[in-house]
C-alpha cells in the first residue's frame, strides 16, 4: 500500500505552489480554482497544475462562507489531507488526485463526490464514523488515483531531468 507521506517526500510534484485570491466571488474563475478542470480532458500541464496548486485566500483573516447549517470549510483540513482542494466558486472541495486521474463518472452522486461534484457537507468532514475526508482517503478509487499520481510524477521527474 502506498504511503501519502512517502509520496510527498519522494516527489517534487506533490508540493503545493500557493496562489492567492482577493475575493470569494470569482468571475471569471480564479486561476487556482479546481472547478476549471472539472469534467474535461486534461493536458499534462493541467494535470500538474491541479496536483500542485491550492487556492489560498489573500488574507489570514479570511472567513470562509457558512453553509445552510451554519458550518464552514476549515483550511486546517488541508494539513492532514494534502489532496484536498477548496473551490471558492463552488464553496466546496475536490480531491486533486481523483480529479487529475478520473476513471469514469457514475449516476451515484457519492461516487462522484470530491471528483466532479464538490464536497460541501462540512458537518461530516471529520469524525470516526462519518468522516468523509478519511473515508475518501481509503476508497479504492482514491488509492488507484494515488498510485497513478506517483507513477505520473516519477515519469515527469525522469523526463524533465534525463
What spans do the regions from the language model cover?
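N-terminal leader/early-domain signal
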Residues: 1-162
Amino acid at each position: 500500500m502506498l504511503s501519502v507521506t512517502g509520496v510527498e517526500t519522494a516527489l517534487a510534484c506533490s508540493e503545493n505552489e500557493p496562489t492567492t485570491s482577493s475575493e470569494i466571488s470569482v468571475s471569471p474563475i480564479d486561476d487556482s480554482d479546481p472547478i476549471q478542470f472539472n469534467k474535461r480532458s486534461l493536458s499534462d500541464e493541467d494535470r500538474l497544475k491541479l496536483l500542485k496548486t491550492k487556492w489560498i485566500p489573500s488574507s489570514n483573516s479570511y472567513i470562509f462562507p457558512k453553509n445552510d447549517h451554519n458550518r464552514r470549510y476549515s483550511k486546517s483540513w488541508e494539513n492532514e489531507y494534502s489532496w484536498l482542494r477548496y473551490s471558492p466558486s463552488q464553496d466546496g472541495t475536490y480531491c486533486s488526485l481523483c480529479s487529475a486521474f478520473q476513471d469514469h463518472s457514475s449516476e451515484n452522486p457519492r461516487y462522484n463526490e470530491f471528483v466532479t461534484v464538490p464536497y460541501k457537507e462540512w458537518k461530516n468532514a471529520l469524525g470516526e464514523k462519518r468522516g468523509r475526508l478519511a473515508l475518501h482517503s481509503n476508497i479504492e478509487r482514491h488509492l488507484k488515483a494515488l498510485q497513478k499520481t506517483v507513477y505520473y510524477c516519477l515519469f515527469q521527474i525522469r523526463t524533465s531531468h534525463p
